[in-house]
Amino acid sequence: MTTKTRFAPSPTGFLHVGGARTALYSWLQARANNGEFVLRIEDTDIERSTQAACDAILEGMNWLGLTWDEGPYYQTKRFDRYNEIIAQMLEKGTAYKCYCSRERIDALRESQAANGEAQKYDGCCRDLPARDTDEPFVVRFKNPIGGSVVFDDHVRGRIEFSNDALDDLIIARTDGVPTYNFCVVVDDWDMGITCVVRGEDHINNTPRQINILKALGAPIPEYAHVSMILGDDGAKLSKRHGAVSVMQYRDDGYLPEALLNYLVRLGWSHGDQEVFSLEEMKQYFKLDDINKAPSAFNTDKLVWLNQHYIKTLDPEYVATHLQWHMDDQKIDTSNGPALAEVVTALAERAKTLKELAASSRYFYEDFADFDAEQAKKHLRGVALEPLQLVQQKLAALTEWTVEAIHQAIEQTATELDVGMGKVGMPLRVSVTGAGQSPGLDITLFLIGRSRSEQRISKAIEFVADRINS
């Protein structure tokens, strides 16, 4: 039997890290078993569902590279199918119309609460004969009486619910709209889902859904209910911990590989290995290896992984993601070095692509002023001679290469009998406007000959004015 999994978010908000991890685990279960992955949008909550949220979910999935084989399916486009099944259940007697008023239901719950009883529907309309009336009604599933529902969860082991603890679930509201728990069952059946991976908050839905599947004569899928993600302080994950949109991580400069690697390790492990490519995840992933204990979100670990991937992935690939940040920061990359070369030069220092973009601006744009602190420290009178001599050496070069630039800087220090820092730091501030950059040879090479010479001339003029003031 072909493994078939699904990710079924509700479009009431963005795709957050918890949802992204569930999607990843479900995707990996399909890919690890040569199966199929279905994307389904559960938009039956019409009042809260928005197209913007739906678009954000699709954008997040695409950015992460979690491609789907079927879908996206939308529940609101399947109402005819749900109503068809409800009609069949009413005819077979596995569902019934309930005419109880809201007032009666509220009074029942208040009475049960006062008596310390579980609050559930009492089956008042369960065995009433059919009646011809215009009274409003809901449709309820006729849950089995007695016995229990047992299933083996890949994460949590054997789970059992008594049927007596379950009430007769509403499967269609008074307006005729089918309910979430019912739509999920029909969808999983129709789409041939063999394994359901979802959050632990759905555990209580599972026995109800299994009972409906049994009533329909449908196969029961496997289940894996993953634990919640906590903040590093042990509290439920919130925005202050990192419970933000997946696309916010893109905006903050993270690579999708880093976020995927981080998310897969939030509850799953393979020995002591920390860094996993997608291919390795597909090779090693097993649902039974997911830990049922909650996982703590640690931003420092995510940053470490991001640094790793910026340094080790193909610079051409990293450059495709960096381009978004260059555009976002309004840096025109058409007049300057190839972005992949900038990635190679700056990757060792960069924590995020957002930082990398900001620190690469001087490769593409001239700066109005030198950093005041760095200029005060390094563009002093003693810097005039080194800057003038290195300018002459660079102007005399027949080729503008990293090796030739390096020799020109070294020769300047040798002829002046000073340390490299006496030449290097004034030169660095001259061409970058600041005090940090990669090696000066590669920095000048990437800035380009014309720009470098113009900036050194500007620095010499700055130092001369300072001497004369």
Swiss-Prot record:
Catalyzes the attachment of glutamate to tRNA(Glu) in a two-step reaction: glutamate is first activated by ATP to form Glu-AMP and then transferred to the acceptor end of tRNA(Glu). Gene3D superfamilies: 1.10.10.350, HUPs. CDD domains: GluRS_core. This is Glutamate--tRNA ligase. It comes from Shewanella sp. (strain W3-18-1). ATP binds at K239. Its cofactor is Zn(2+). Its EC number is 6.1.1.17. Keywords: Aminoacyl-tRNA synthetase, ATP-binding, Cytoplasm, Ligase, Metal-binding, Nucleotide-binding, Protein biosynthesis, Zinc.
